[in-house]
Amino acid sequence: EGAYVKEPITGLHKWVVSFDLNSLYPHLIMQYNLSPETLLKSKHQDITVDDMLKGIKLNIPDKTTMTPNGALFRTDKKGFLPTMMEELYNERVTYKKKMLSAQQEFENTKDNKYKKLISRYNNIQMARKISLNSAYGAIGNQYFRYYDKAIAEGITKSGQLSIRWIENRLNKYLNNILKTDDDYVIASDTDSVYLTMDKLVTKTIKSDNALSKTINFLDKVASESIEPYITKSYDEL
């Protein structure tokens, strides 16, 4: 199975905000320690994404992780694949920061030397991004030396769990605030969710002519309330 794509709630929606899971598949590889040499060959448990969403008690041995396809991975030793993902991700973060810094220097000085640095750092961080995103494709390629269907499926099923988990949690969060029982996630796709914040805006912003005020309000809610809540929710998962 591939990624989870929610059937969109059709119609015209006001005040839509989106939240992305940063480098989802590489982070899942790191989170579950997914690698050919960490995969346990014991019989996989009969488990589904729905079971995990319902909070069914899992029988997971010590020092192991289990993906939603029932595959087990040892955690007493870090696999080569998550190690590689971590190194590539850290390098990308470093060069992306350098690129942004060079962009700021160019804005301040208009010195063309920073244009070359911007291009160089951007090329490096994009190369790291492509390498990160290729890991899942490689592990799911039957002609790849380390091909393993259980690992590839473990990645996509874990992605399904992650996006559906946060969809449920965000709906719970907004319904609790607004005292409603609605579906505020109008769409989700692989690693992104789209929320309609119209009812929250209507309840909070009273002025008829408050476009900038509303945008600032939503920016603040997203950064100071929803993003920390998303982080906390994934810690619980």
Report residues per predicted region:
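Conserved acidic
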Residues: 1-237
